[in-house]
């Protein structure tokens, strides 16, 4: 498990090529309100052959709750804008796929994409 505190700039966290059973969990810790910086998770090598599958729960700071899902075939970026808090788990399912689950609390919805947002 990796904890991330307040940071001084946007951060990119690059996951290695997926492998069955390889697991990473990332959570924020001690953020002050909305951190003011974005966090991007990406898969090393990326492209459409390595991707995320699954979804996360978005807890809007305006008290709305929604699900944010991958397209299940090509998204290799997870973009989290100005998080208040997050807890994300990635589990390698094969040599090309990470399953993703967790939640993000923010005023801005996170997004999965094929390129950095």
Spans of model-derived segments:
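Exposed extracellular interaction/assembly regions and N-terminal maturation sites
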Residues: 1-64, 93-117
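Sequence/structural signature of small/polar-enriched beta-strand/turn repeats
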Residues: 28, 81-85
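A conserved acidic, glycine/proline-rich C-terminal tail/linker
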Residues: 66-77
């Amino acid at each position: 498990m990796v904890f991330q505190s307040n940071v001084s700039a946007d951060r990119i966290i690059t996951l290695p090529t997926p492998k069955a059973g390889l697991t990473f969990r990332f959570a924020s810790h001690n953020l002050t309100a909305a951190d003011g910086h974005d966090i991007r998770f990406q898969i090393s090598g990326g492209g459409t052959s390595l991707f995320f599958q699954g979804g996360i729960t978005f807890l809007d700071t305006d008290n709305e709750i929604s699900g944010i899902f991958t397209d299940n075939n090509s998204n290799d970026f997870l973009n989290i804008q100005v998080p208040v808090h997050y807890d994300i788990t990635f589990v390698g399912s094969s040599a090309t796929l990470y399953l993703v689950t967790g939640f993000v609390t923010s005023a801005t919805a996170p997004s999965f994409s094929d390129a950095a947002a």
